[in-house]
Amino acid sequence: MPPGCSFLNFTASHDGIGVRPLEGWLPQHDIDALVELMHRFGGYASMRTRDDGEDAPYELNITWFDAMKGNRRGPDAWQTPRFLCSQQLMLGLRGIPAIYLHVLTGTLNDLEGVERSGRLRSINRRRWQRNELEWLLETPATPTREVFKSLTRMLDARRQEPCFHPDAPQRVLDTPPSLIALQRGPTAEGRRLIAVHNVTDRPQPLELQELAHGQWHDLLAQAPWNHEATLAPYRSLWLVSEGSG
């Protein structure tokens, strides 16, 4: 990366979720299964014509919140935790994060918008009425309120953390497939941050060599980390250490 340049990280935008980058990385049957799953979750797929004349998906048309509705077994009870895990993972990556409005509000598929416009991308371009959005944000137990409060808390913590500077080093840590973990830093002062994510719907043992020693602080809880041995489904941690390492 040239000096003065940075990655721009985001999961969703006003367009669809691109799937062409998966080509060559995932088997075609896995891509096909993903497309079918998004159909089951109320979304669509925009298609292109390949050189051989066959149709192939180039983007998924679905809100990111509804894309997190379940896994290959179908919808489940983990939609909001899964969604928040995906955002905390993105926010921890080296670079500058961007969050689309309808990610910040946990917006559902706008199927009426698709019918009105005749465009698949309208599914993720809902036009909020102010009173409707304010009601969702102010009413306890709505997904919109939970998502908005959780994401703004993450953003506040991230903004004040030196290890999240766009130029801070990043290293992906060795973990089982059920976990994704990375280290940001160390900074010039020796401060390090470990971001670890359980990307499954089952509790997972948390056994990272990098966390075995030293005192760690839970950035979001604003409290010392208690060295929990198990990470709950779709739970994420941002842990910081002041010492060198």
Question: What do the predicted segments below correspond to?
Answer:
Residues 1-213, 220-244:
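Active-site and adjacent substrate-binding regions of carbohydrate-active enzymes
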